[in-house]
């Protein structure tokens, strides 16, 4: 998160004999006439295909009947299928069409699409002296104030990290050729024109600035030059990354277990976003997610509120809770997130603050541990919590004081 996550409560509006239509809270930046439609868990691929055929036919009939003054809706624009347990589609629909969709037996719930933003406000052991970011030294030390990062030479080798963000400057020399472009779901610019994603990726796996110095990095661009994008676009990026991490869509558990994902972004609480994240976790992929920067309970943000992901709050250099960091029972661990120095597009560096900077410390640590032979997947978050120190002073009501180590 860059500055604030939007507090939201999803309230179900009644749809007569139909699916729930979830209403965004008053501060959500909803996108007019854009919706995410989620199918019931027992809907098969065949039934899903039949449903989308019905949808197209219904839309065509409405198009033929519409008046010349009414705006034509684009209809279905994206389809999602994550792990066989989350099937959905998104698109542009008018109120009458949404009512028809909500009354279809296959539909579980519908929620408005909205804007999502970045979350910025930062063995054979090798010694890295005088580290360029205090976060590296803190992860490698039991006490605050260190300047050295100790790491095993494996350093995440053989592991792939998917950075779902604003893109990555894959030519930055600190990546040493280990970063590559994956997929762009937001614009026509296959570059990081914002800088957030490059900074995050640098903490995950930069040669000088990262925790997992040998990890492979993949850019999944879902946020634009302003650091924003749609929730439906983010879910498309999540779906693509899951397929790639699972062996190019072949669903191999071995490939999934050697992959990690980082999501230093978020928005209002979204059942669709949480369900997509849970599908990724159930596919055996470790996910680190920023808790958000509104100094409120992270249960109101997504995907931070999804229990199966590893939700990360931000700490300061003196082991305090960063003043902006979200908190609450959904937070799994704290990680350095205030004044974190990492990479900037064009070959330079930048210092940023936010739970966006904390989450990649956990993602990088996850990749590092998998490289050492630890079991991947969502259970890796429990391993990280067991290794963590109870170090955070005044972590927030009902919040763990554990800081990664």
Swiss-Prot record:
It comes from the Eukaryota. CDD domains: Peptidases_S8_PCSK9_ProteinaseK_like. Keywords: Allergen, Glycoprotein, Hydrolase, Protease, Secreted, Serine protease, Signal, Virulence, Zymogen. InterPro entries: PCSK9_ProteinaseK-like, Peptidase_S8/S53_dom, Peptidase_S8/S53_dom_sf, Peptidase_S8_Asp-AS, Peptidase_S8_His-AS, Peptidase_S8_Ser-AS, Peptidase_S8_subtilisin-like, Peptidase_S8_subtilisin-rel. Disulfide bonds: none annotated. Residues 34-118 form the Inhibitor I9 domain. Its main location: secreted. The keyword Secreted applies. Glycans are attached at residues 121, 124, 250, 262. GO terms for molecular function: serine-type endopeptidase activity. PROSITE patterns: SUBTILASE, SUBTILASE_ASP, SUBTILASE_HIS, SUBTILASE_SER. Its EC number is 3.4.21.-. GO terms for cellular component: extracellular region. Residues 19-125 form a propeptide. Belongs to the peptidase S8 family. This is Subtilisin-like protease 6.
């Amino acid at each position: 998160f860059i500055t604030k996550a939007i507090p939201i409560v999803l309230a179900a509006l009644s749809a007569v004999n139909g699916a729930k239509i979830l209403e965004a809270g008053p501060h959500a930046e909803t996108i007019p006439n854009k919706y995410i439609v989620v199918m019931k868990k027992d809907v098969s691929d065949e039934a899903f295909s039949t449903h989308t055929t019905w949808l197209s036919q219904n839309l065509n009939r409405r198009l033929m009947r519409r008046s010349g003054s009414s705006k034509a809706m684009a209809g279905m624009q994206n389809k999602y299928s994550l792990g066989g347990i989350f099937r959905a589609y998104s698109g542009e629909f008018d109120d009458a069409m949404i009512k028809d969709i909500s009354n279809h037996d296959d539909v579980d719930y519908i929620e408005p699409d909205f804007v999502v933003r970045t979350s910025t406000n930062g063995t054979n052991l090798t010694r890295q002296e005088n580290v360029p970011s205090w976060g590296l030294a803190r992860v490698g030390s039991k006490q605050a104030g260190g300047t050295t990062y100790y790491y095993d030479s494996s350093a995440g080798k053989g592991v792939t990290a998917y950075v779902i963000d604003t893109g990555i400057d894959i030519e930055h020399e600190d990546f040493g050729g280990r970063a590559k472009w994956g997929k762009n779901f937001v614009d026509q610019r296959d570059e990081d024109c914002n800088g957030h994603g490059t900074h995050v990726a640098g903490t995950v796996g930069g040669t000088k600035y990262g925790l997992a110095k040998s990890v492979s990095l993949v850019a999944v661009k879902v946020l634009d030059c302003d650091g924003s994008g749609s929730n439906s676009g983010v879910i498309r990026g999540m779906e693509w990354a899951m397929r790639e991490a699972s062996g190019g869509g072949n669903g191999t558990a071995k490939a999934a277990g050697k992959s990690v994902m980082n999501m230093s972004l978020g928005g209002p609480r979204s059942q669709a976003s949480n369900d997509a994240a849970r599908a990724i976790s159930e596919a055996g992929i470790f996910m680190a997610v920023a808790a958000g920067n509104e100094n409120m309970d992270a249960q109101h943000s997504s995907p931070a509120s999804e229990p199966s992901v590893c939700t990360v709050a931000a700490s300061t250099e003196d082991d305090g809770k960063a003043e902006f960091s979200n908190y609450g029972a959904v937070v799994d661990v704290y990680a350095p997130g205030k004044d974190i120095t990492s990479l900037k597009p064009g070959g330079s560096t930048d210092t940023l603050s936010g739970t966006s900077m904390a989450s990649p410390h956990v993602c990088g640590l996850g990749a590092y541990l998998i490289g050492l032979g630890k079991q991947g997947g969502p259970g890796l978050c429990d391993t990280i919590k067991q290794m963590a120190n109870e170090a955070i002073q005044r972590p927030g009501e009902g919040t763990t004081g554990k800081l990664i180590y």
